[in-house]
């Protein structure tokens, strides 16, 4: 446990795309990042679980090259007035990190939740 080197994986998953950014433990320095468009070319496939697995596998290889063997995961959905549940790529990415041999510390949901923010879109319902 003393020789573990940790990083933080920020997974932003919507129903249109999945973006994974890996930073150092403070969140200041970006170590590696990937998005759906970097893996597949069709826009309809950017948010798919398969694409998220490919991205996580590539990032796991980059992390191993840099000597990082453990990550904490922060999952984020669009939030605010939008969808509060993460897209299909989030769970697939977490599984792919684990399958690639990266140790997972904490999994945290950091979706922004409004404390009665702006008015939601759509007409008035009576």
UniProtKB/Swiss-Prot annotation:
InterPro entries noted in UniProt: Ribosomal_uS11, Ribosomal_uS11_archaeal, Ribosomal_uS11_CS, Ribosomal_uS11_sf
Key word Transmembrane helix present: no
A Pfam family matched in the record: Ribosomal_S11
Keywords, ordered alphabetically: Ribonucleoprotein, Ribosomal protein, RNA-binding, rRNA-binding
Source species, domain of life: Archaea
GO biological process, alphabetically ordered: translation
Cellular component, GO, one term: cytosolic small ribosomal subunit
GO MF annotation: an example: rRNA binding
SUPFAM superfamilies: Translational machinery components
Quaternary context: Part of the 30S ribosomal subunit.
UniProt family annotation: Belongs to the universal ribosomal protein uS11 family.
Function in brief: Located on the platform of the 30S subunit.
HAMAP family: Ribosomal_uS11 (MF_01310)
Protein name per the record: Small ribosomal subunit protein uS11
Organism: Methanosarcina acetivorans (strain ATCC 35395 / DSM 2834 / JCM 12185 / C2A)
